């Protein structure tokens, strides 16, 4: 899904949805209370967020795994595999699995470290240990109570923050913010804090800053037709503008959108007519029909920490 515009507003519609939001929050609280967390055989680092619609957890999880490898550890990723048909636990094999099997994020994660998809996280953690992991990095799952987390990172998009501060469906929050903050060991703010995220955080909560930067791009000053089916496609479009690209058209689809071959051909033809390159995200690229991939450019990004040593020290203290 795409984040509705009213999730950033405090108008009539969020107020009308307040009863549904209260029911959602109650259901979340009951689930937390009814679940006894399981302690995995190895430490667990959870990279999650407070809102629906994406905040950049996957690139942060990839970076955390890279830092762990630099510290001599053997990380494995654990993911729910949103959008995939396999409940798992299953070890992701990019040569065998497609996004329809395991979801798009796990395919990206599997290029960096062993990756397990599991609806039941404790079973997934056990498989990750069997695969040789001495530390598990959970991509998302801050609200999932089934595993004990040794380090919980709350990732926040500095350009979106916590929206209107309301719980779904009245706003973007997965639960009342204070509950998420209670279980977070640190916050990671991605990009410029234009929504005053820092003010909403407890004074004693460690805060780290990072940005998602293009890597290996040769799109500078090129004509580009951009398309994306992610939580906040505007972030992708703004990244392209900042390169800078000449963005001739943008097409936004729902999060985890499954592309039809005809859909891609229309985009490719529109790009050709505009004398532009069709460009998408890494997450979208793995969801494209295989025959269409050679016709589409992909913009790769990486995490750049304001202070990577602070992140390494935080990891070392917890795992």
Each predicted region: which residue ranges?
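Phosphate/Mg2+-binding loops and adjacent switch elements
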Residues: 81-83, 87-203
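Residue-level signal for inorganic ion chemistry
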Residues: 23, 58, 109, 139, ...
């Amino acid at each position: 899904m795409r984040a509705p515009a009213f999730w950033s507003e405090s108008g009539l519609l969020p107020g009308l949805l307040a009863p549904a939001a209260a029911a959602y929050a109650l259901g979340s609280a009951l689930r937390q209370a009814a679940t006894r967390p399981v302690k995995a055989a190895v430490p667990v680092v959870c990279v999650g967020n407070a809102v629906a619609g994406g905040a950049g957890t996957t690139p942060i999880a990839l970076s955390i795994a890279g830092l762990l490898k630099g510290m001599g550890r053997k990380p494995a990723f654990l993911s729910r595999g949103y959008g995939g048909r396999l409940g798992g636990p299953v070890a992701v094999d990019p040569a065998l699995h497609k996004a329809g099997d395991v979801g798009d994020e796990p395919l990206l994660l599997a290029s960096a470290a062993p990756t397990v998809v599991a609806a039941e996280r404790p079973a997934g953690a056990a498989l990750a240990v069997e695969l040789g992991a001495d530390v598990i990095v959970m991509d998302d799952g801050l609200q999932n109570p089934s595993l004990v987390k040794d380090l919980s990172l709350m990732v926040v998009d500095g350009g979106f923050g916590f929206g209107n501060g309301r719980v779904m469906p009245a706003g973007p929050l997965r639960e009342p913010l204070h509950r998420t903050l209670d279980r977070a060991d640190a916050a990671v703010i991605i990009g410029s804090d234009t929504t005053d995220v820092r003010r909403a955080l407890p004074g004693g909560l460690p805060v780290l800053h990072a940005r998602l930067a293009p890597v290996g791009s040769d799109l500078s000053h090129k004509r580009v037709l951009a398309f994306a089916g992610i939580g906040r496609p505007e972030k992708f479009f703004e990244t392209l503008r900042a390169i800078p690209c000449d963005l001739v058209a943008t097409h936004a689809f729902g999060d985890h959108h499954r592309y039809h071959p005809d859909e891609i051909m229309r985009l490719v033809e529109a790009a050709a007519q505009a004398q532009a390159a069709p460009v998408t995200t890494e997450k979208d690229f793995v969801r494209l029909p295989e025959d269409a991939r050679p016709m589409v450019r992909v913009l790769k990004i990486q995490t750049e920490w304001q202070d990577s040593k602070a992140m390494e020290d935080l990891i070392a203290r917890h795992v």
